[in-house]
Design a protein with these regions (language model features):
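Conserved HGGG/HGGXW glycine-rich cap/lid loop of the alpha/beta-hydrolase fold
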Residues: 120-172, 430
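C-terminal subdomain of alpha/beta-hydrolase-fold enzymes, centered on the catalytic histidine
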Residues: 280-435
Length: 435
């Protein structure tokens, strides 16, 4: 079930491979850059396998239920498969089914994937991922957004899809010369990329997690250059501001007179987010020394979040196959990106967001939002309640919201877990805002 404040669109069929589209729907457009495929060296992959072979697991008794974190036995199985069964070259070939580019933007090397739109008038759409995701977490929605007709949709809804890697999160490699990188500074890079580098006069934007904050900042600072934005959370842009921004509970008390269900939900969400925010904001560099040296340790840290944040019903394989997990982990490993990816959290607080103007709402670009009940606040149970809680609450005042939806299926990264819902919601946000 789902709830929204606008009319539903079409569910999407399974993805086609790149190259299977109807060429008659192509809208030619000269692109100003030459593609550059992803290629990880044999030496880097050999070093990865050697390190996996030398993995020394910790003593981990009494943890089969994940109550102490990732169980050693579960991780051992994935590490063995990473060493003996997983084939990065297969994943690399799938990734290279799309165009890839690396271009300097204000001196920062930026990698992005491009999928040309196929329709009468595609509009450019930049999609931004979060942590611990990579650009490849958008892979389930790229083709339907670029070529709606191939999936039973309206070709008038086509986008030219641009999917960058957040600097310091993956390709082209570790981020240097930008130690103060954070979400609002990336928004400036993205605007320069889309307008000055790629030559788009106007564009659309979407994002989840950190990517939602990047996208909201675009909608705040560069609203006149946007058709609109679509995001997977309604966090205010000052979410990481303040002396205790690492406290996910925001000082909410636990009292004996709270309803049991409310109390349980508060505790559940604190457990889901507390260690992530606290470590990344306070001493991420300390942890990074271990994660940068041990692929098994890196996988464990990522895996804890993929398991806790996905709507998997106790079965992680229902959301991510082993190959899915290891493709994303391999991107982090071969690029040496874990330390700089975690730096975004501390820097969002150390270099706090400040408004670029005093107009209200803060995010003036037309905004669509997609929520999932898996992340409902305490006391909110249904999709209708989730939509109502947002539209009547303080976060809504930040946004020029034009399309708010909630769905029963999906977790923290909705475009991966429920791509059909994300596609439908995003199309609805922009359907009447195209030229």
């Amino acid at each position: 079930m789902s709830a929204n404040l606008a009319r539903h669109g079409h569910a999407q069929p399974p993805l086609l491979l790149p190259g299977e589209e109807n060429p008659a729907m192509t809208t030619p457009r000269a692109f100003p850059l030459e593609p550059r495929p992803i290629q990880v060296s044999d030496e880097v992959l050999a070093d990865l396998r050697a390190r996996l072979a030398r993995t020394r697991p910790p003593v981990d008794e009494g943890n089969d239920d994940w109550s102490y974190g990732v169980p050693a036995g579960y991780l051992r199985g994935l590490v063995d498969y990473w060493h003996d069964g997983y084939d990065w070259r297969t994943a690399e070939a799938a990734i290279n089914g799309y165009e890839h580019y690396v271009v300097p933007v204000d001196g920062i090397p930026v990698h992005f994937l491009r999928r040309p739109g196929r329709g009468p008038r595609p509009i450019p759409l930049i999609l931004t991922h979060g942590w611990p995701w990579t650009f490849w977490h958008w892979s389930k929605v790229i083709d339907p957004l670029a070529d709606p007709a191939a999936f039973g949709g309206d070709p008038a809804d086509a986008f030219e899809v641009i999917v960058p890697s957040l600097p310091g999160f993956g390709f082209p490699g570790p981020l240097t010369g930008f130690p103060d990188v954070n979400f609002w500074k990336v928004a400036d890079l993205w605007h320069t990329l889309m307008t000055d580098t790629l030559g788009y006069e106007k564009y659309a934007a979407g994002g989840c997690d950190i990517g939602a904050l990047v996208t909201s900042q675009l909608g705040h600072k560069y609203a006149d250059a946007l058709y609109g934005i679509h995001i997977g959370s309604g966090l205010p842009l000052d979410f990481f501001t303040g002396p205790r921004a690492w406290d996910f509970a925001r000082g909410r008390p636990l009292s004996d007179d709270q309803p049991a269900a409310i109390r349980a939900r508060i505790i559940e969400q604190d457990r889901r987010w507390a260690s992530h925010l606290t470590v990344h904001m306070l001493d991420g560099a300390t942890l990074a020394h271990g994660l940068a040296d041990s692929p098994a340790g890196l996988l464990a840290w990522l895996l804890e979040r993929w398991n806790a944040w996905s709507d998997n019903g106790g079965d992680l394989a229902s959301v991510f196959t082993k190959d899915d997990l290891l493709t994303h982990a391999t991107i982090y490993w071969v690029t040496g990106a874990i330390a700089t990816s975690m730096r975004y959290y501390a820097n969002a607080n150390r270099y706090p967001w400040t408004p670029s103007h005093g107009r209200t709402p803060v995010v003036q670009a037309p905004t669509g939002l997609t929520f999932v009940t898996y992340e409902n606040p305490p006391g909110i149970h249904t999709t209708d309640e989730r939509v109502a809680a947002f539209t009547s609450g303080p976060q809504a005042t930040w946004f020029h919201h034009v399309n708010v939806s909630a769905h029963d299926h999906g977790g923290h990264f909705i475009p991966w877990e429920n791509p059909a819902a994300w596609i439908t919601d995003l199309r609805r946000t922009f359907h009447t805002r195209r030229p």
